[in-house]
């Protein structure tokens, strides 16, 4: 793949087409979209510069530090409430690290902590866990605040604390994973996952690409479920 500056400029100029359409239809939305694209551009420039040196150095401690920093920044930006950030960051970092190493072992990576393998795998696992966990812990907290009498009723009828929390945990898991499972139903039927497209464009065979996608999907579902459970556990302990 050989993408030159002129080719990149041509691709960016294509944004003028939707911009002209929005200019005629909704200028307020155009301003909002322009701000989002400008922020995205700045983020990509900074990210590219950082990743260039991270991949250039390719040292174990640098790669681990990069994953810890990016996951912390992503958690702070995506999770608006303070009570979401600490439980999600701790559980996500620990669980995805363990399962990320498992993925690297399963795909027989030449070096577990090399940047081309370690950083993409950890990033994909943490992104999925972050989206699901924020939705899950928000549901859990809101359900407990809206129905405090249910927990007291269950405890009054002899249920332990864990048993009394079970309805709230069930609701959190159900709501958190429903969108993810719905998306999986469309894979292969309506669209091809971007990960699979990237592997095919990178020269991997269809068999190896699908095998890696299957491994990542299985591990992501498992690690995300455990991350959500540990997130709720940590929140319950510190709240």
Report the location of each language-model feature.
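Loop-to-helix entry region at the N-terminal start of transmembrane alpha-helices
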Residues: 3-11, 62, 66, 83-135
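Hydrophobic alpha-helical transmembrane segments of polytopic membrane proteins
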Residues: 206-236
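Non-cytoplasmic
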Residues: 182-207, 227
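Alpha-helical transmembrane segments of multipass membrane proteins
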Residues: 14, 18, 47, 70, ...
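Short cytoplasmic-facing helical segments at TM-TM junctions of multi-pass membrane proteins
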Residues: 139-172
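C-terminal ends of transmembrane helices
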Residues: 19-31, 73-84
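Transmembrane alpha-helices
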Residues: 164-190
